Amino acid sequence: MKIGYARVSTGLQNLNLQEDRLNAYGSEKIFSDHISGSKSKRPGLDKAIEFARSGDTIVVWRLDRLGRNMEDLITLVNELNERGVSFHSLEENITMDKSTSTGQLLFHLFAAFAEFERNLILERSSAGRIAARARGRYGGRPEKLNQKDLNLLKTLYDNGTPIKTIAEQWQVSRTTIYRYLNKLEEKEDEKQGEVSN
């Protein structure tokens, strides 16, 4: 059985073109989603997969209707294969049926591209972090308290002000105050170590 799946990203788009192509190809049942491909929950696709039985084929108008990226597509094709379901894209004229040697070749090519895409993303992310560090930027949230606040915090603490009161003054948790105090203590230890050398 051929099971169609159609997806549009916005409410401004409609499914008519995709559904017409899926019907012309002989899809007996069509499931659809009006949702961005970047969303992980696609109820129409989930229903299509659940409906499909071994020997069925899920048909899409274009590959990008099925997966957000190559990795998602590979994961989905694997899931379909485990169920004995093949996959066909009309626009690209690609059939992925891992029971055939051509289907296996295509699957491995797609898997290689998915890994390549993952590695490119990792390389770009790493290069971005290195470039940011070179400009003096580091990841994570900015510190809540500046050096002036830290000096006042230390003075209040040294004068016996309760941690709870200090935390309320800066609207942070007591754990955060303890963390700042530990950092200040470490800095003082480092300075004393430098002086004694």
From Swiss-Prot:
GO term, biological process aspect, one: DNA integration
GO MF term list: DNA binding; DNA strand exchange activity
InterPro entries: Homeodomain-like_sf, Recombinase_CS, Resolv_N, Resolvase-like_N_sf, Resolvase_HTH_dom, SSR_resolvase
DNA-binding region: 163-182
Keyword Iron: no
Catalytic residues of the enzyme: 9 (o-(5'-phospho-dna)-serine intermediate)
Record Pfam families: HTH_7 (PF02796), Resolvase (PF00239)
Domain Resolvase/invertase-type recombinase catalytic: 1-136
Key words, A-Z: DNA integration, DNA recombination, DNA-binding, Plasmid, Transposable element
Function: Resolvase catalyzes the resolution (a site-specific recombination) of the cointegrated replicon to yield the final transposition products.
Family named by the database record: Belongs to the site-specific recombinase resolvase family.
The name this protein goes by in its record: Transposon Tn552 resolvase
Species lineage: Bacteria, Bacillati, Bacillota, Bacilli, Bacillales
